[in-house]
């Protein structure tokens, strides 16, 4: 098998010199039972995720100085092995400071205590601090040995530090840049090398040369130090290279200057909120349409790495000496749940998919099917209508057009949703058209005009323009349609829409009707769409993921007062001697299920049990 060669240019990431647009989802291995990693990875892949990003929290592995723990759910080597077996790429976020709503941002208490006693200075080039970092990186390298990309392993990316220069770090820019370079050199010396080294770039964070800057955005700010409603977020506008000033506003509010040259990099994200983690004082709920709309606004504005934080929730591991969540008691701004890190995200802490999982999934299918056209496509904003006055503007159409000049085609992105607001319904007509002026491959300016689109309140549209198609061996162009594009599978072109059948139109370059090559799905079916192809010459099979159904179980009774069983889930350390029995009647078709589907869940606070499928 030919080794994949990963690189990047100012337009996109590349694999074997071809543009790619990966989907990356955050999942913390040490916050999830090791026996369920394979199921979690498989379900992430089913959702369209190509790369799993994960923190290595220092405190999870060295709570007491010199006492290292890479066993059980903390076993990084075993997790990387699961990823390799599943064909899932990995982006390791090795810190040494991570945040991630972890105690001390991931620093062990003993290390923090050394700074308090004046023994060292954290997050600097202080030799005493670097001595401990060197050992931490050594331990990570031992775990990752054989799993780096150079060894044909799954690790293709490494993130150094987190929010450095925004949430902590020196105010002196050169000093901060130097420290980032120091950490990278230390990691590489240990064998922690990868095609991509990244650094978070929002809020003025330090991004030296030879680092990829990654950005993010959240639909709300549970870390904000107040409980009043936020102003309408600009994350729901199409803004190329957008910097969400609300990220980490608990550390430094309002910083949004870049320390890197945006012309040298494509727009990459690592922290698009797949949900929101609750805090004690601010328990914000991420509506699924919020998550979908924000993602499409980033994609339409040119994002060429869609990275979610989090994509799969989890549970904080038990600490030997303390609990392991962020808290005010440790000097941080927020109190977080002691155990739950559910994040209200795509795959919840119990492994169940949420509505956001399905809403995003159809866009991931589209991205995978069109990435070679989409990734090099330049972003254009409308030139015949004004930009929205602000995110509170519910009247102005929000749209962006990504045009690939080499292929002479593009995709129109429209978002008519704003969190906790109601946007007006809109009509794009010949009297009120939508116009973009693009520059083609010959340097000539051309107008792209759309004039037959109905935009409902909360609508999110992804419409192809001049799309190259092959039907019965002949090449055509799909000039226009008002149905969102899912992709081409087995020679059939799939679209989805909630418009009435009589209102859907397709305009082909040859003027004919190619209905036999088109399938129009409901939005629901697009979200559940699956295509499996056994071989290159096979037609392939289309199927749908199952919906979640909730049914009331039978009455619970105590069947036996047996012997107590010790478990890590015992509440307050007390064993439970009762054995419970119930009857659950449910029609079950194994072929239709997600691996790891939960068919019965019992939740008693910090104790839980469940029955899962295995396929």
Predicted features along the sequence, with ranges:
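N-terminal carbohydrate-binding accessory modules
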Residues: 1-51, 81
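A cross-family glycoside hydrolase active-site/sugar-binding cleft signature
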Residues: 23-28, 55, 91-95, 159-161, ...
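Acidic-and-aromatic substrate-binding clefts and catalytic sites of carbohydrate-active enzymes
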Residues: 29-35, 61-62, 66-73, 166-167, ...
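Aromatic-lined substrate-binding rim segments of carbohydrate-active enzymes
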Residues: 37-105, 109-110, 184-189
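Aromatic- and acidic-residue-enriched carbohydrate-binding clefts of CAZyme catalytic domains
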Residues: 55-60, 64-67, 72, 100-128, ...
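Active-site region of glycoside hydrolase catalytic domains
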Residues: 85-88, 99-247, 253-278, 297-303
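Carbohydrate-binding surfaces of carbohydrate-active enzymes
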Residues: 118, 129-144, 151-156, 160, ...
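Aromatic-lined ligand-binding clefts that engage carbohydrates, nucleic acids, or primary amines
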Residues: 590-615
């Amino acid at each position: 098998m030919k080794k994949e060669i990963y690189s990047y240019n100012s337009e996109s990431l590349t694999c074997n010199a071809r543009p790619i647009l990966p989907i990356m989802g955050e999942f913390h291995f040490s916050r999830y039972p090791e026996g369920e990693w394979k199921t979690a990875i498989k379900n992430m892949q089913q959702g369209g995720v190509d790369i799993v990003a994960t923190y290595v929290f220092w405190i999870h592995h060295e709570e007491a100085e010199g006492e290292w723990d890479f066993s059980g759910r903390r076993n990084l080597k075993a997790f990387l092995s699961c990823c390799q077996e599943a064909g899932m790429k990995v982006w390791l976020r090795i810190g040494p400071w991570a945040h991630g709503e972890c105690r001390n941002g991931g620093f062990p208490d003993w290390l923090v205590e050394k700074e308090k006693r004046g023994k060292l200075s954290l997050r600097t080039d202080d030799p005493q601090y670097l001595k401990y970092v060197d050992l931490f990186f050594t331990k990570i390298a031992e775990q990752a040995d054989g799993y780096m990309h150079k060894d044909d392993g799954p690790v293709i990316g490494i993130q150094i530090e987190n929010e450095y220069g925004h949430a902590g770090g020196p105010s002196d820019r050169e000093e901060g840049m130097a420290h980032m370079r120091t950490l990278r050199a230390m990691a590489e010396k240990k064998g922690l090398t990868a095609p991509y080294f990244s650094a978070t770039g929002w809020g003025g964070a330090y991004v030296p040369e030879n680092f990829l800057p990654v950005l993010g955005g959240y639909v709300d700010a549970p870390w904000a130090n107040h409980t009043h409603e936020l102003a309408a977020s600009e994350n729901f506008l199409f803004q190329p290279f957008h910097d969400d000033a609300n990220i980490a506003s608990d550390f430094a509010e309002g910083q949004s200057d870049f320390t890197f040259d945006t012309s040298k990099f494509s727009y990459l994200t690592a922290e698009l909120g797949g949900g929101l983690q609750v805090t004690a004082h601010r328990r914000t709920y991420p509506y699924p349409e919020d998550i979908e709309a924000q993602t499409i606004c980033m994609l339409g504005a040119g994002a060429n790495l869609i990275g979610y934080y989090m994509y799969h929730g989890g549970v904080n591991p038990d600490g030997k000496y303390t609990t392991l969540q962020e808290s005010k008691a440790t000097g941080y701004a927020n109190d977080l749940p002691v155990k739950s890190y559910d994040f209200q995200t795509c795959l919840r802490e119990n492994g169940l998919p949420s509505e956001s999982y399905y809403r995003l999934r159809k866009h991931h299918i589209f991205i995978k099917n069109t990435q070679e056209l989409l990734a090099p496509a330049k972003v254009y904003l409308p030139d015949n209508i004004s930009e929205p006055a602000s995110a509170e503007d519910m009247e102005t159409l929000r749209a962006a057009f990504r045009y690939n000049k080499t292929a002479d085609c593009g995709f129109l992105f429209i978002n008519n949703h704003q969190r906790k607001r109601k946007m007006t319904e809109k009509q794009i007509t010949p009297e009120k058209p939508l116009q973009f002026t693009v520059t083609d491959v010959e340097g000539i300016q051309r107008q792209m005009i759309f004039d037959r689109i109905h935009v409902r309140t909360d609508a999110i549209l992804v419409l192809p323009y001049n799309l190259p198609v092959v039907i019965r061996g002949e090449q055509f162009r799909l000039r226009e349609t008002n149905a969102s594009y899912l992709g081409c599978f087995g020679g059939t072109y799939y679209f989805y829409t909630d418009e009435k059948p009589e209102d859907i139109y397709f305009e082909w370059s040859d003027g004919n009707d190619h209905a036999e090559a088109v399938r129009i799905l409901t939005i629901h079916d697009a979200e559940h769409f699956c295509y499996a192809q056994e071989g290159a010459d096979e037609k392939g099979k289309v199927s749908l993921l199952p919906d979640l159904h909730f049914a009331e179980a039978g009455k619970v009774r105590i069947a036996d007062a047996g012997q107590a069983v010790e478990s890590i889930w015992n509440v307050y350390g007390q064993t439970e001697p009762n054995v419970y029995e119930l009857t659950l009647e449910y029609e079950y078709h194994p072929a239709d299920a997600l691996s790891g589907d939960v068919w019965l869940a019992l939740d008693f606070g910090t104790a839980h049990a469940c029955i899962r499928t295995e396929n």
